[in-house]
């Protein structure tokens, strides 16, 4: 922690320099002749605008905002231009017992700042109270924090977008590719060193070409909002690599700007759009980097703590901690709700972002008594003319009471389905009693999502995510190995449903390695042949490893970065994944617009889905209840497609066969009305199979243990 120096004499300015301005829009807004400043605070008594030199190091002026309208302090500074560096000092009561933590000695970041300059330098002066004082956070610290806080920068929003526009991929054709701005390019040989780990690095042709050729539709970036590195991590020589510690919801993190200019983000978006790829941002509106009552005063805490945060009703000194990080933003407050929706509209309208994934999204729908799908935030998103046009993805849980809300978000939202992850992992690991749940996961978990006109794509299916094992590690480790995090391997989940197949970590055993490769193919085939919206993680497509680390949040290192030096097995897996994605996009029956529920269509005499036992007959209730059942056929009859439109793949009939037994199971290929024969399109045991061989009805196909097959029904006229 840096020791603060004695504060310099306070700078001042003539009151006549600033005009009254307007209370809207919030933030610093240039009109060509000057800049309007507007800051919400319901409980402050005075606000000073602090002007700094171009380096953000010397405070030149303090100017009191002259007007207060509808809880907005505002003023207009003539002749101010883009590039102006500023911050705020906010006056008011320091009364933590009643939720107030005003301290004008602390320079504060504008919640609406569009760009930050400088890094946060940890110092005792950042805290509104005196560290080590007997009264703890009830004490009052008089040291100036300005030398240690990032400053705000007025931007020129003008940008020549040309013909750029949102890609607007339909949900049924959406395949999400989760990645990290820094992690995807740090080890890529084609990315120049000076732009590695930045938005410019993601624009490099070879990086985009890999993503485009893979066949995914949407790139989801881990948080790019300006964030704070935790003090305890810096002490250990680490950083908050993932960035789930936001401090400015309108500003990209300066570390991701190789050029130092906001235009770099816009150029990245345009490049991805040109490659026909959507840009989805992982956003963290559930908490801020200010932490609990013992945290620093950086922005909202010092602007109006009682308005921005949810506080304990019986003692407002303390924070409700539904985020698990120390504080929780209060989106039931109209001005906090406005800030979040303004931020979303800014990224969608000004930055051309195509969608958002909301971290711990249950918090965003919480009132004091719990989650409410009619929460003002959720309603606002559905009604907003901009936000209702972009993709909205919820991580539907948080750390508070009743936080698990999978399936309970309103229509218009897509939700991470952790039950898909857990069931599919358990099934391919060979756990008992998984068959019925596995069948449900393959068909978009209708028991959770088939309501109120929601579509199968509402279930966002994933095997792995940034949080947890990579796919390679999932089949290579029984236990986490987070020693590099320097937390005695106590961090990260112990419930991974992983299996190392006989040896912990890398091995030279060819049988184990072959089985691991097959299991990765099983996972990918399950993910990409299931109903719902699939998401894969960058590097999984070629078997990236994190060396058993399942919590790489602090690993801004080779552990956390994607390794582009592909092994032969990695190249083979990549080729297989590309085939699966192409098949998914070719056959609409794999991404139906309605849930398949086993309904019988009397007009054509078929069910939309039929569940088959290994003997080729329909599964009985008794067979569903058998705990040791691990083999299942899933017959998707294309004649039951709801549209009736005939186009290539639209009316294909497909049969998926899964066998999680360790031994071969003979599976009888079923008869289908109107005749035909079966062609094997995918066999995870023989990845080279491409439909070369035909099989008649009632043929007993020997399904290798721990493998998945995909058959297509063909007729003579199809050949």
Can you say where each PLM-predicted feature lies in the sequence?
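Carbohydrate-interacting/catalytic domains
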Residues: 2-177, 182, 199, 507, ...
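Conserved, mostly hydrophobic/aromatic
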Residues: 39, 88, 179, 221, ...
């Amino acid at each position: 922690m840096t020791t603060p120096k004695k504060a310099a004499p306070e700078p001042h300015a003539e009151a006549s320099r600033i005009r009254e301005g307007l209370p809207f829009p919030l933030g610093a807004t240039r009109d060509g002749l000057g800049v309007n400043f507007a800051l919400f605070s319901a409980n402050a008594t005075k606000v000073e605008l602090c002007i700094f030199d171009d380096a953000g190091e010397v405070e030149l002026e303090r100017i009191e905002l002259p007007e207060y309208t509808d809880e907005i302090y505002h003023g207009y500074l003539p002749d101010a231009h883009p590039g102006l560096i500023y911050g705020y000092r906010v006056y008011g009561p320091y009364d933590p017992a009643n939720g107030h933590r005003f301290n004008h000695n602390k320079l504060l970041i504008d919640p609406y700042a569009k760009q930050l300059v400088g890094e946060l330098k940890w110092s005792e002066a950042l805290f509104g109270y005196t560290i080590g004082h007997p009264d703890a956070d009830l004490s009052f610290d008089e040291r100036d924090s300005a030398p240690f806080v990032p400053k705000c920068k007025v931007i020129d929003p003008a940008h020549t977008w040309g013909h750029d526009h949102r890609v607007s991929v339909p949900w049924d054709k959406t395949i999400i590719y989760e990645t990290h701005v820094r992690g995807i390019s740090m080890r890529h040989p084609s990315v120049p060193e000076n732009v590695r780990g930045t938005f410019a690095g993601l624009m490099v042709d070879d990086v985009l070409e890999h993503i485009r050729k893979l066949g995914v539709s949407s790139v989801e970036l881990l948080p790019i909002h300006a964030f704070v590195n935790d003090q305890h991590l810096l002490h250990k020589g680490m950083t908050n690599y993932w960035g789930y510690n936001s401090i400015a919801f309108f500003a990209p993190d300066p570390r991701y700007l190789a050029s130092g200019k906001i235009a770099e983000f816009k150029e990245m978006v345009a490049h991805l759009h040109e490659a026909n790829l959507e840009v989805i941002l992982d956003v963290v509106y559930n908490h801020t980097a200010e932490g609990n009552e013992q945290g620093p005063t950086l922005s909202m805490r010092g602007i109006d703590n009682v308005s921005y945060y949810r506080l304990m009703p019986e003692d407002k000194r303390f924070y409700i901690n539904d985020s698990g990080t120390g504080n929780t933003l209060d989106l039931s407050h109209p001005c906090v709700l406005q800030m979040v929706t303004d931020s979303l509209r800014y990224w969608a309208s000004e930055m051309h972002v195509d969608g958002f994934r909301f971290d711990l999204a249950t918090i965003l729908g919480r009132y004091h008594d719990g989650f409410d799908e009619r929460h003002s935030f959720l309603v606002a998103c559905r009604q907003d003319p901009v936000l209702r046009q972009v993709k909205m993805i919820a991580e539907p849980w948080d750390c508070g009471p009743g936080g698990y809300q999978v399936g309970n978000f309103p229509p218009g939202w897509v939700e991470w389905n952790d039950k898909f992850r857990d069931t599919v992992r358990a099934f391919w690991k060979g756990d008992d009693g998984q068959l019925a749940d596995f069948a449900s996961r393959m068909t978009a978990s209708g028991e959770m999502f088939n309501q109120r006109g929601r579509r199968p794509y509402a279930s966002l299916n994933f095997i792995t995510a940034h949080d947890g094992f990579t796919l390679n590690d999932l089949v290579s480790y029984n236990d986490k190995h987070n020693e590099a995090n320097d937390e005695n391997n106590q961090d990260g989940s112990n419930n991974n449903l992983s299996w190392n197949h006989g040896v912990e970590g890398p091995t030279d055993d060819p049988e184990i390695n072959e089985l691991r490769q097959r299991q990765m193919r099983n996972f990918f085939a399950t993910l990409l042949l299931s109903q719902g919206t699939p998401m894969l993680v960058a590097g999984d497509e070629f078997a990236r490893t994190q060396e058993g680390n399942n919590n790489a949040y602090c690993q801004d290192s080779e552990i956390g970065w994607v390794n582009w030096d592909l092994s032969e097995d990695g190249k083979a897996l990549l080729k297989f994944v590309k085939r699966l994605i192409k098949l998914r996009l070719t056959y609409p029956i794999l991404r139906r617009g309605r849930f398949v529920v086993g309904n019988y269509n009397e007009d054509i005499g078929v069910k939309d889905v039929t569940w088959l036992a290994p003997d080729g007959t329909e599964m009985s209730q008794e067979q569903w209840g058998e705990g040791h059942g691990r083999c299942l056929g899933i017959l998707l009859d294309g004649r039951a497609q709801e549209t009736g439109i005939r186009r290539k793949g639209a009316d294909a009939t497909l049969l998926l066969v899964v066998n999680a037994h360790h031994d071969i199971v003979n599976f009888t290929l079923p008869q289908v009305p109107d005749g035909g024969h079966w062609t094997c399109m995918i066999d995870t045991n023989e990845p080279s199979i491409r439909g070369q061989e035909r099989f008649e009805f009632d043929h007993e196909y020997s399904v290798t243990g721990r493998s998945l097959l995909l058959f297509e029904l063909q007729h003579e006229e199809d050949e």
